[in-house]
Amino acid sequence: MKADDVRYGVVMVHDFLLSEVFPYSRFDPEKAVHLVVFPWAGASALSCLRLCSVVGEAVGVLAVEMAGRGTRGDEPAVRTVEDVAAEVTSALVDIMDTSALVVMAGHSLGAALAYETASQMSVAGLAPAGVILSGRAPYRVPSGSSKPWKCGGCPERPDDVYLMDFLRNTGSADESASLNEYQRREVLDRLRSDLVMNMDYVPELRPVRFPMFCLTGREDVIATPEACRAWRNYTAGYFELVTLAGGHFYFRNYGAE
């Protein structure tokens, strides 16, 4: 395996499927467990790297890069959660043994991607050992409405003001301030696309049994603890909800990126 970059114990690889779907990876077929990490809206595989230093060397890490983002910025952008999940599932089936222990993890949009991928993997015969869903409810129903409100916590067509507020809340506004107008427009358009993708996804109830661990901030108004508890209905396996101090990006209270 050729590595051009090493950060947080993870190599940037240029080798078959790892280089395309998982550009930043700590992949080793001999490791007992691999953690597949999905980015939140506006983020890329690079955003997931700090997690690798937390889980330790014993666990393999595969950081997902969606088409049109990060190292795959020259590709046409993927538009649906289902399409991302299908690509990741195909890649994992090709590189993983069916006996491998694989855990899906993601925050907000990443949680939607993690659940959908885990569900598609189960159908493909590579059922995950567990799923960690952070900062996202399966749906939310507004008062007085008979229709599920498509989760995502943003307007149907988020404008630039909303997007800049989002960047400030995620601690990314300073980085975007240093960009030129063309680069800033690219960042905002990509973020808008990701938020709409998240909002448009409503998970299906499927006969899956993988363990599910949900985390959310006690002050999160997008994915409230009560709304996240509804994930209990989406697996016949073990379920646990953990609430932590903070809002939607509660993990920043703990020094995590």
How does the language model describe each region?
Residues K2-A105, A112-E257:
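Domain-scale detector for complete catalytic domains at protein termini or as standalone homologs
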